[in-house]
Amino acid sequence: MGIELLKQEHYRIFDQTSLGNTFHATQSFAMDDTLCASVATEGAAIRSWVHHETVVLGIQDARLPHLDDGIDVLHAHGFQPVIRNSGGLAVVLDAGVLNISLVLPERGGIDIDSGYEAMLALVRRMFAEETDAINAGEVVGSYCPGSYDLSIAGKKFAGISQRRVRGGVAVQIYLCVNGSGSARAQLVRDFYAAALQGETTKFVYPTVVPETMASLEELLQRPLTVEDCLVRVYRSLMELGATLTPSVLSEVENERFGVNLGRMLDRNEKVLG
């Protein structure tokens, strides 16, 4: 089912990988909600995005007993926190992490596993020439662990999540393309250590083991860039028969984006001040 979901006739393309430091993660989450709401009429979309020195926190992270101390750790390393509008836990974003959102219409219903399988199929096609060893399954010791962690030889390089809004589904992945996967994990480990301070909580936060994470460049032992990976995304979709059209939001979508961004900013203001 996953590969079949990828076989859309047409994709709108939104490339937001080179917008720099002025492009804030709150804008990204508002963007995906906007595309989900219009996908039934405007068609499937693929959005790529990069954020610099950002740690995206989940709803449970916002309930950490010493959150302010954890945020101080992030600031000390030059990172800014953002609260996402869905579940999941802390994830590190920087210039070496490519994020991809696959936005599909829920015509006939898309079950949760099918959405994950579609993204897994895409990533496997992207790197089919380099490896056939990309596995899906929780990597214990990684940050934001889940059943659709992607790994090679037991080391996680990507995680997949989903967001469903108004008849559309956004399947989102972060791909650690280059840089040190273990250094990113060390940052998250330090964040949780400061935010928990040894306290027992009702929710069990991950015990991060930095050695469980790596970048694709480290795992494949060849130079990789975000730009190279983005070309692989587009090529893989075109090989499946899709036409790709660089796009911008319509007037209606722009208005909706403004509303969605306002909600994201309000959410972050309440938690982070």
From Swiss-Prot:
PROSITE patterns: BPL_LPL_CATALYTIC (PS51733). Residues 40-245 form the BPL/LPL catalytic domain. CDD domains: LplA (cd16443). It is an enzyme of class 2 (transferase). One of its GO terms (molecular function) is lipoyl(octanoyl) transferase activity. The keyword Transferase applies. InterPro entries: aa-tRNA-synth_II/BPL/LPL, BPL_LPL_catalytic, LipL, Octanoyltrans_LipM/LipL. One of its GO terms (biological process) is protein modification process. Keywords: Acyltransferase, Transferase. It catalyses: N(6)-octanoyl-L-lysyl-[glycine-cleavage complex H protein] + L-lysyl-[lipoyl-carrier protein] = N(6)-octanoyl-L-lysyl-[lipoyl-carrier protein] + L-lysyl-[glycine-cleavage complex H protein]. It comes from the Bacteria. The active site is at C144. Pathway: Protein modification; protein lipoylation via endogenous pathway; protein N(6)-(lipoyl)lysine from octanoyl-[acyl-carrier-protein]. Coiled coil: none annotated. The record marks K156 as: Lowers pKa of active site Cys. The reaction proceeds via a thioester-linked acyl-enzyme intermediate. Catalyzes the amidotransfer (transamidation) of the octanoyl moiety from octanoyl-GcvH to the lipoyl domain of the E2 subunit of lipoate-dependent enzymes. Belongs to the octanoyltransferase LipL family. PANTHER family: OCTANOYL-[GCVH]:PROTEIN N-OCTANOYLTRANSFERASE, OCTANOYLTRANSFERASE LIPM-RELATED. This is Octanoyl-[GcvH]:protein N-octanoyltransferase. It comes from Exiguobacterium sibiricum (strain DSM 17290 / CCUG 55495 / CIP 109462 / JCM 13490 / 255-15). The gene is lipL.
